[in-house]
Each structure stands twice: as C-alpha cells, then as structure tokens.
Amino acid sequence: GARLAPFDIAELREIMSYDEMELDKIGDRKTALFLIMSDTDTTFNFVIAMLQSQLFNLLCDKADDEYGGRLPVHVRVIADEFANIGQIPQFDKLIATIRSREISASIILQSQSQLKAMYKDSADTILGNCDTTLFLGGKEKTTLKEMSELLGKETIDLYNTSETRSNQKSFGLNYQKTGKQLMTEDEIAVMDGGKCILQIRGARPFFSDKYDITKHKNYRLLADENEKNRYKVEKELNPQYTPKSEEEVEVIHVELSE
C-alpha cells in the first residue's frame, strides 16, 4: 500500500533491517542521541516517530523489569519541532506514565494549535501532563487566549467619580474591587522579544528575561561561537574524509614499537 511505499527504497530497508541503536541501554548510562530530520520533506518523519515510540516503551519496560520501576540514569527527550515529527502512537498515555520511570519529555512547538492539529482531542491530555509551560512569544490567537487564561486574574481597585454641575453642585465617589486578566491577549502578543513567561505547577507564573546563551560557560564549544566546532557527518560516513583547506585539524603522532 501507499503507507509502505517508503520501504521500496533500498537504503531505508537497510537501516530498518537490524538494530544498531541499542535504545534499551540509554537508561543504563549517560548517552546523547541526536535525531535529525528534514524540515522541508516529511517523507521519513514516520521513522523518527516509530523510534521514539519504541524508545519510550522499551525504557518503561526495562525500568519495570530490571530496576524496580525507575531507570538508574534519567532520560530526557528534547523534542524540538514536535508537531513535525509525526504522530507518536499512544503518546497521550505514554507522557502520563514515563515520569515515574525517570523519563521526561520537553515538547517544543510553534503554537498549541500545531499539537491539536496532530493529536486532536488528545492534545489537552498531553498539555495537562506537562508540569512546566514556557512561552517564548508568538501571536497565534489560540495560544494567546490559553496563555492569558492560564495566568489567571489579579484584583485591582476601581474608583469612579461623578460630578454634577447645576444649581446644587454634587460630587460622588464610588470604590470597588474587580478582577482583571494578569496579562491580556494583546499584552502577551506585544511582549518584548527578550522576555518569556514560565508557569510551573504549584507556583505563581514568572515573567522573566530570556537566558542569554552567549553567557553560558560552554557557549565557546558551539559552532555558533567557532565554526570549527561544527559536527561534520562526512567524517563518520567516509573514513577517508579529506579536510577542506579552511578546516583546522589536530594531528596526533603515535609511535608504535616493533
């Protein structure tokens, strides 16, 4: 059928024919696994969705069967452009159970409507299982409305004065307390680009400055700081990779005794 058409590609069949990932061992030791997909072609997104589904299920089973319910090493999944990965089967149920196994997930979206388009009625369940919500800015109406409602209301003092000018001059003052949205939708929409809103379950929301990544002690190790730090996949794919003229390479001399 059409859904299996990608498997007509020999390279994909080769990748899927055997296991080199050892996903079940990620919770045993510190591991960094990067899943990189095209942001313009969604043909192979289902592969990453399948991998993540297997990852969650394998780690949950291993936590239960071998470690008494919790993995020895915390596993954090940072799912950037989550809506473009493809639908992960039963994710609304997985996200409710993984935390007890020492697994967490950070879902990164352009707007909440992306999640609802992908997961339909299950989107609210997924959002409800996220203890922390970090809003970096945007102007999508549904997201703005939900953020405003999430922040809640504040109490303000309202004074009304009235004055009548006639033969008998009168003056009136009315005082009352009323509720107002902590931040209205239009206030959130025009929020300064250097600000963010952080909501943690059980705590009042924070209106804060975004962290300046250039001040991080390890920023110097990123390719943004120095191009020579950029990971070159060609080196892994081609053992006889020849560095380009502008690349800096480290030469190590090893003397072998006879």
Spans of model-derived segments:
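P-loop NTPase motor domains
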Residues: 1-103, 118, 128, 178, ...
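Conserved ATP-driven motor cores of ASCE-family P-loop NTPases powering translocation/secretion/packaging/pilus
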Residues: 95-197
